[in-house]
Amino acid sequence: MLVLLSCAKTMSAVSKVKVPLTTSPRFQKEAAEIALQMSQFSVDELERLLRVNAKIAVENYKRYQAFHAETTPELPALLAYTGIVFKRLNPKDFSAEDFGYAQEHLRLTSFCYGLLRPLDVIRAYRLEGDVVLPELGNQTLFSYWRSRLTDTFIEDIRSAGGILCNLASDEMKSLFDWKRVESEVRVVTPEFHVWKNGKLATIVVYTKMSRGEMTRFILKNKIGTPEELKGFSWEGFEFDESLSDERKLVFINGMGE
């Protein structure tokens, strides 16, 4: 089974965690070209393009200006992203075996690097899928990547057993020809809901935390089938058979009943 996670907006360039090996991103050339185009924008332009405040725009202006320098720090992707999902995944205590398993069974989306393996070394950046770069065909990055990633993604899923556990946010489907993905491999999407005022609700922060915890559960326990995945339990979230089906595994937290 292959797990798909979304990239995070927040990144670090420093980590004390040791990994057994590192690899180069498979779409390094494309990433370098995208970063080069992004380096042409001013701070004000980045603020508008990325819909961020001035401080974040300045930070990413500096990142893009230094992106191609030999001295710019790099980190394995699994350590570089620092959002809620990755904090809960918490690879700090991963063994060499855990990292090796993750390399084969986890993929991370990236608007700059396309599709990443956990040990692919990357540089910090900030980007959105709806950014249009005229030099790359005047199309959104979603469109730019779709034709480039789909074959590789399907091959990765097949190599990992032919089942995709989709723990990425919904917008990431647009990076791939998703209909083709669903027609060629089995896709299972876990959902996380809580009872609130007598109704089922989706709370974003709980969803992100649960995605990270589930990914950790899969990698640490070498979970290979949706049936095994039903055994996931965390902070009150339990599998609910009545709300689930072949494509959707629903986990419910009854704290607000």
Swiss-Prot record:
One of its GO terms (cellular component) is cytosol. GO terms for biological process: response to hydroperoxide. InterPro entries: YaaA. Pfam families: H2O2_YaaD. Disulfide bonds: none annotated. NCBIfam families: PRK02101.2-5. Belongs to the UPF0246 family. This is UPF0246 protein BT_3869. It comes from Bacteroides thetaiotaomicron (strain ATCC 29148 / DSM 2079 / JCM 5827 / CCUG 10774 / NCTC 10582 / VPI-5482 / E50).
